[in-house]
């Protein structure tokens, strides 16, 4: 499948959580975003807001104390929790406090998006690795983006999620080559060596002009929806948050036994189609002035129209 029209019927049936009067707050998805540092505060905001615009009910941001006030000031809709401080020079306390703070929240989530604005502090990555272990033990859906992908390229962490099939990775071309250095696939045409034993169970969303969904070293589908021509910073974070919503819906439908784990790539493809459409609308509206907030503005309407099309 390439465009939304190629697969919309099955995608709506198996990937979009129905709305009905029996739902309560949180029934349509609770997404956590682990990211945000003193230097990077926009990325976790874009990811969390995208999850809400795509249809999730609640969005949490777990970030550095230094990022808390800026992110809170961007929107009252986000629940923002400081989980560590960059000024804490006790490495054991920093890691333990971060793991405990986030660990208490994991049972309340349907999906955890990790990486937007995270930074590459070794202590933070050490704590994140422990959080991922906890999430895996609870069968929580995970979306890894940005600095979390860099972390997974490091030998010390690479096998930490080996065999986990509720994992989505979202590399761009550069991140993909860092994750899979043996791959000679610069144009996305050949999938040989596109994965390895450690990450073979993951669903990989390789971002580009045509987003490609890769599972077990082979491309299973691609998103050929037309997007905008402007590559503004933050659009990848919008996709990460949208994937957070769709993987949350997958988790909810999985609990209802309405879908199987094999439907996760289809959920990712649907999220890619939605963001491409929103990006195209934003670009048509703003052209060169388009930025990530413009994509957020169009995301909900684009997704609603997609699911209502005859």
From Swiss-Prot:
Protein name as it appears in the record: ATP-dependent (S)-NAD(P)H-hydrate dehydratase
UniProt keyword annotations, A-Z: ATP-binding, Lyase, NAD, NADP, Nucleotide-binding, Phosphoprotein
Cofactor: Mg(2+)
EC id: 4.2.1.93
Residue stretches making up the YjeF C-terminal domain: 8-306
Gene3D superfamilies named among the record's database cross-references: 3.40.1190.20
UniProt keyword annotation of Lyase present: yes
Lineage of producing organism: Eukaryota, Sar, Stramenopiles, Ochrophyta, Bacillariophyta
InterPro entries for the chain: Carbohydrate_kinase_pred_CS, CARKD, Ribokinase-like
Residues that bind ATP: 207-211, 227-236
Catalytic activity line of the entry: (6S)-NADHX + ATP = ADP + phosphate + NADH + H(+); (6S)-NADPHX + ATP = ADP + phosphate + NADPH + H(+)
Top EC class of this enzyme: lyase
Entry-linked HAMAP family: NADHX_dehydratase (MF_01965)
């Amino acid at each position: 499948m390439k465009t939304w029209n190629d697969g919309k019927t099955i995608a709506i049936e198996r990937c979009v959580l129905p709305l009905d009067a029996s739902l309560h707050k949180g029934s349509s998805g609770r997404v956590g975003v682990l990211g945000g540092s003193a230097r990077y505060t926009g990325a976790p905001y874009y990811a969390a807001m995208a999850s809400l615009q795509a249809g999730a009910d609640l969005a949490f941001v777990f970030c550095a104390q230094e990022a808390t006030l800026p992110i809170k000031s961007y929107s009252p809709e986000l629940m923002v929790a400081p989980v560590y401080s960059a000024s804490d020079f006790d490495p054991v306390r920093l890691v333990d406090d971060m793991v405990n703070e986030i660990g208490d929240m994991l049972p309340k989530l349907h999906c955890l998006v990790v990486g937007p604005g995270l930074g590459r502090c070794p202590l933070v990555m050490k704590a994140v690795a422990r959080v991922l272990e906890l999430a895996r033990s609870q069968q929580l859906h995970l979306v890894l983006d940005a600095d979390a992908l860099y972390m997974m390229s490091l030998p010390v962490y690479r096998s930490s999620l080996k065999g986990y099939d509720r994992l989505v990775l979202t590399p761009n071309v550069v991140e993909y080559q860092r994750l899979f250095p043996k791959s000679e696939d610069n144009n996305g045409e050949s999938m040989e060596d596109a994965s390895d034993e450690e990450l073979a169970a993951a669903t990989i969303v390789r971002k580009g002009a045509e987003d490609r969904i890769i599972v077990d070293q082979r491309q299973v589908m691609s998103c050929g929806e037309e997007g905008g021509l402007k590559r503004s910073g933050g659009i990848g974070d919008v996709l990460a948050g949208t994937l957070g919503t769709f993987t949350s819906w997958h988790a909810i439908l999985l609990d209802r036994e309405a879908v199987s784990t094999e439907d996760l790539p289809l959920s990712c493809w649907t999220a890619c189609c939605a963001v491409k459409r929103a990006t195209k609308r934003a670009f048509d509206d703003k052209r060169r002035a388009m930025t990530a907030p413009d994509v957020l503005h169009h995301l909900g309407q684009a997704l609603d129209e997609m699911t209502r099309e005859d």
